[in-house]
Amino acid sequence: NKQPDFLVTFESNEKLQKGISEIESEYPYRKFCPLENLYGMHLYSKLPFEEVSLRFLIEEDVPSMKVKINHHGQDVTLYFLHPKPPSPTENTYAKPRDVELNVVGEEIAETEGPIVVAGDLNDVAWSPTTRKFKKISGLLDPREGRGFFNTFHAKYPLVKWPLDHVFHSEHFALVNIEKLESIGSDHYPLYTELALITDKE
């Protein structure tokens, strides 16, 4: 039974929002963007927001969130992303996804302090796009040396890919990362526990 400080849902709409409304008592700080196009996003937090912004960086129907909190006296910046994948039913090419990751990566490179990025990037960790994002942003992948943590597809036992990601700056140490049991989605939940190193400059 996990009790994360932040819980983020992707592909979420008003129906899901109502269906899990009982958790709102545990998460007093929230930002919702329910959509019916599979790109809705809901953020639940136990920690207060200093700033929270809903952004449409590349496509007008694909949101992302940028959040700032203060934790143990340090300003922490959080990004939550879910760009469209290249597919016959979505984008026929990868450019919007790649551009969004480049934009966020370049923004992170100019941002000081602790940073975490989490989301369904619709891309695997070893792809040129994801590797470029890590290089531009300078962020770390907590899965390296620990496994793939294949979160998609939860309903096909022989076809699984690590499409859900968490990246963090060197201001954090990994405590735990694990793929949780299926909750009925086509993605498994990915639980990541990070410890902020409070004396990191």
Please name every model-derived segment.
Residues N1-E201:
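Soluble catalytic domains of enzymes that build or remodel membrane lipids, polysaccharides, and related
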